[in-house]
Amino acid sequence: MKNVLILGGPGNISESTIRYFLEKKVPVGVLTHATTDLLGLDGKISVFRGDRNDIEDLMRVYREFDPEVIIDFCCFEPFQAKVVVEAVKQMHCARYIFVSTVDVYGYPLSRLPMRESDPWGEPNCLYAKNKKECEQIFKEGFADTSTSLTIARPAYSMGKTFALSAFERNRGKHIVARIREGKPVYVPGDGNALLQTGSAYNTGLMIARIAENDNCRDQDYTCGHDRLNTQDEYIKAFANVLGMPVKIVHIPTDFMYSLERKEVEDSILKDLSIHNIYFSVEKFKQEFPDFVWEYSMEDAARAFIEHQDKIGTFDKPLEEQFEDKVLEKWEKAMEALRQEIDF
């Protein structure tokens, strides 16, 4: 296999993709605008500074690096897809891997576990809507060209730089901080909703295997963990890694919506957290029966905590979030109610 060009990164998922190809002695180039952390890959990859939204930058990198395969980890908006299609048509690249998202299937899912071929619902957030439109732009743009398209749709992939809370996509660090401080952690509903937490390390390897296998041309694959967990188990994974107890407080989602607060409306509760999240990876397993999901959910939580400690995320107390303030008032109200119920 000749050169592999990564658009974006090195990041949460793409790091293990890059390391996989480096171990196989495949040259890897990365087009990035980042000027700092390369996650320990300094000197091991060809780094091209530039803007993936600029067709001239894309063409410059193509001429210098001559990739056989391009893996796009950072296409989030339709205009970005259009720029890439125009550039790749001039490049004549053999394969293009678009990293989309399982959110394009729409929630609630039409089937559990959700397969690639099952009926899709409408996207319920702008992120998913844009990714779905990008998929269509790539499909139409690469039709009848020499470039074959493969779509990889990662499920939730926790890793060094990314962990969800039930309320926001970037608040995993607040879960860690609250457990360390002995504070309760909010979980919606009764905590038994399915989440299917995966490791970014595993997901990155799945994408690498797809990118090197010609059988995957013109296909789409869900990339996620092969096991399930509940939302309560997700929080407990952080506590287990920290070696500390955690108090989980369940608050009904209907109550959260009844507050009619912008913070709730803008949260991921409606988009994600109140639904059962369960995707089939059987299509991937049929193509790669030897694949091993090496990292567990706790391994992923450990990678997140260790990296965030390393970069100083927890050096200063984290600001209390909206859901934490609601949780505190909920606890007081529930205690008052317990005292009222005396019969």
Model-derived segments and spans:
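Substrate-positioning beta->alpha
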Residues: F167-I175, P188-A211, D218-Q219
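Mid/C-terminal beta-alpha module of Rossmann-like enzyme folds, strongest
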Residues: R209-L269, A303, F314-F343
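Glycine-rich Rossmann NAD(P)(H)-binding loop
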Residues: V187-A193, Y221-L228, A239, L272-S273, ...
